[in-house]
């Protein structure tokens, strides 16, 4: 079985997340996802994500903190999806590879038809974001 490492960006602007709608011609057409793509051999996850965001969105992103990973079997392939937070980037995202974009509150994202592999990443992001530091109660 083929194993593929994929990176995804949870892009945050003013408390809202960027969701991208997959092209009707691609895999999982019409579903919403965190933008990203495959990690090339010899490439680090942050480098791959910065490259993918430039190719897909025409932005120059500075990759922030690691969020979570999720493994899923899709069409006879094992996909290891790794999410990273992005708060800082140059340029305005453009839909070069996606049908549409939406900026939404994190909880609102569950109202979109999300790609199944992205749901646990969103849940992990929200649990970290909503966590209370020890000793702050």
Residue ranges and their predicted role:
Residues 1-17, 38:
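Conserved N-terminal beta-strand and adjoining loop/helix that marks the start
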Residues 18, 33, 85, 102, ...:
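Conserved beta-strand segments that form the floor/walls of ligand-binding pockets within enzyme
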Residues 26-31:
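A conserved beta-turn-beta hairpin within the catalytic core of GNAT-like acetyltransferases
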Residues 91, 103-120:
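C-terminal structural segments of small proteins and small subunits
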Residues 117-137:
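Charged phosphate-binding loop/patch that engages nucleotide di/tri-phosphates or the phosphate backbone
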């Amino acid at each position: 079985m083929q194993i593929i490492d994929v990176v995804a960006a949870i892009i945050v602007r003013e408390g809202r997340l960027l969701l991208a709608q997959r092209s009707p011609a691609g895999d999982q057409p019409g579903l919403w996802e965190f933008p990203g793509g495959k990690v090339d051999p010899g490439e680090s996850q942050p480098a791959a994500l910065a490259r993918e965001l430039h190719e897909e969105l025409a932005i120059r992103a500075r990759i922030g903190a690691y969020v979570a990973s999720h493994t899923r079997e899709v069409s006879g392939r094992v996909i290891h999806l790794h999410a990273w937070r992005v708060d800082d980037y140059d340029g305005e995202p453009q839909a070069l590879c996606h049908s549409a974009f939406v900026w939404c509150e994190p909880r609102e994202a569950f109202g979109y038809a999300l790609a199944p592999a992205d749901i646990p990443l969103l849940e992990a992001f929200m649990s970290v974001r909503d966590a209370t530091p020890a000793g702050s109660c």
